[in-house]
């Protein structure tokens, strides 16, 4: 009897945690989709800038937060929002122009470097394409020094 009670408590706790994560990621996904449709690509990817929020403001994440919520999940199903978010970072980074990529790198290299190497590699690609050899070399050096394990694409 005690065993069944313990199992019930564990299942209820897990179910409650799963529902909370599901609800939060659905909210983040809806916000990310809205920002994406408005052309606010970096906000769609990274969510709201937490440094600009006041205490009473509600935080809304982006595709990154949806992915982070479910990435290490081993039990239970992942929601559709997770699978729909998987390709968004690459799609968004490939849509950014040189100025947006540079701003992205400058802002997030210190705060949260996820996707910074990908953005720097895309900036390398655009620099090479436009003949901006100085920027190409700068981004190559940046990637080599700051992210030595990142595999730069052949350009």
Predicted ranges, named:
Residues 16-20, 77, 110-111, 131:
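Structural signature of alpha-solenoid helical repeat scaffolds
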Residues 36, 47-96:
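Extracytoplasmic/periplasmic/luminal assembly and interaction segments
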Residues 17, 24, 29, 36-37, ...:
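Hydrophobic/aromatic side-chain positions at a characteristic register within alpha-helices
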Residues 82-155:
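Non-cytosolic head/periplasmic domains of membrane-anchored proteins
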Residues 40, 52-55, 130, 147:
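Sec/Tat-exported extracytoplasmic proteins
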Residues 2-20:
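Hydrophobic membrane-insertion alpha-helices, especially the h-region
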Residues 28-48:
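Short extracytoplasmic/periplasmic juxtamembrane "stem" segments immediately C-terminal to an N-terminal membrane anchor
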Residues 20-21, 26-27, 65-71:
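Alpha-helical membrane-targeting segments
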């Amino acid at each position: 009897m005690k065993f069944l009670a313990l199992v019930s408590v564990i299942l209820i706790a897990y179910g409650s945690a799963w529902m909370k994560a599901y609800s939060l990621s659905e909210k983040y996904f809806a916000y990310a989709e809205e920002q994406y449709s408005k052309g606010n690509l970096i906000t769609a990817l990274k969510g709201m800038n937490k440094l600009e929020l006041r205490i009473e403001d509600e935080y809304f994440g982006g595709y990154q937060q949806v992915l982070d919520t479910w990435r290490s999940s081993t039990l239970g199903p992942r929601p559709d929002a997770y699978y729909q978010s998987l390709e968004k970072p690459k799609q968004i980074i490939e849509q950014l122009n040189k100025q947006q990529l540079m701003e992205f790198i400058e802002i997030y290299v210190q705060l949260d470097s996820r996707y910074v190497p990908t953005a720097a590699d895309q900036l390398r690609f655009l620099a090479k394409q436009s003949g901006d050899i100085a920027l190409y070399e700068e981004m190559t050096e940046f990637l080599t020094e700051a992210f030595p394990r990142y595999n730069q694409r052949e350009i």
